[in-house]
């Protein structure tokens, strides 16, 4: 028979373990979960996720501060796309990388909460741009060493759901990452370019000859990873390369405060701005 104090300590540890495995609180707002349709998130938070607003760059979906940016040229491109046109034909990104979506992506990607793959992919499917079409869907690959460490490729899990929805084959082994690169997160745009140069290769170029490719990734930051993949595919003889990402980082000097608060439902102070 365990003493009462020992029993209480054991029960407390069991509750902590259970909360880690099966959280009873929303990972975004901390409110108790009940029968919410999305794992780890309450319905109220999930429903605050809003698509990226117009106006955006006609090539890479970079948000513009003002609608005046496209007043005279509807197909206006951002400075980066004008100065150094990307190798992809068009990149669509569907949502701003802000809470609660940011919380969901981080939990999915870095904490292994794989049950979020389906609802995140469904967000992408629900917001697919009109006219999107391709012959093959390809996820941005991880280097084998990083794949072994993480045990899954988040981009492949998203691409698999998209391929099913679009009735298109998903090629997960043709575009491969051959170089171990430093994490892109803390690097500048130029450092990212240097970091990823010659990082990818194509195993079977004939399988992709002339085919339109849809690259899929989770987050668009500067676009250097997608662009290096697109460059590799084009050099191997593919047709047009398009890119689709679930979310993109938004810079506070490019996106008005109003947009940030509208798309999160939270005051700026809670966003750390």
Task: Write out the residue ranges for each language-model feature.
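Glycine-rich phosphate/pyrophosphate-handling loop used in enzymes and phosphotransfer proteins
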Residues: 1-216, 221-273
């Amino acid at each position: 028979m365990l003493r009462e104090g020992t029993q209480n300590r054991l029960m407390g540890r069991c509750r902590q373990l259970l909360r880690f495995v099966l959280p009873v609180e929303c990972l975004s707002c901390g409110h108790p979960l009940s029968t919410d349709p999305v794992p780890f998130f309450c319905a109220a938070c999930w429903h605050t996720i809003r698509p990226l607003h117009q106006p955006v760059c006609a090539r890479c979906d970079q948000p513009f501060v003002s609608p005046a940016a496209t007043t005279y040229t509807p197909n206006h491109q951002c400075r980066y796309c004008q100065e150094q046109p990307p190798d992809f034909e068009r990149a669509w990104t569907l949502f701003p990388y802000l809470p609660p979506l940011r919380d969901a992506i981080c939990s999915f990607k870095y904490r292994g909460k794989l049950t979020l793959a389906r609802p995140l992919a469904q967000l992408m499917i629900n917001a697919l741009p009109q006219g999107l079409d391709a012959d093959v869907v390809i996820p941005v690959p991880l280097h084998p060493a990083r794949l072994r460490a993480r045990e899954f490729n988040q981009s492949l899990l998203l691409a698999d759901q998209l391929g099913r929805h679009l009735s298109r084959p998903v090629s997960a082994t043709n575009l491969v990452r051959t170089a171990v690169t430093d994490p892109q997160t803390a690097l500048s745009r130029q450092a990212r370019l240097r970091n990823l140069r010659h990082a990818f290769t194509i195993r079977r170029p004939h399988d992709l000859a002339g085919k339109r490719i849809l690259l899929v990734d989770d987050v668009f930051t500067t676009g250097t990873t997608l662009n290096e993949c697109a460059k590799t595919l084009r050099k191997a003889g593919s047709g047009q390369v398009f890119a689709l990402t679930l979310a993109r980082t938004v810079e506070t000097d490019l996106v008005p405060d109003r947009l940030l608060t509208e798309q999160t439902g939270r005051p700026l102070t809670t966003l750390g701005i």
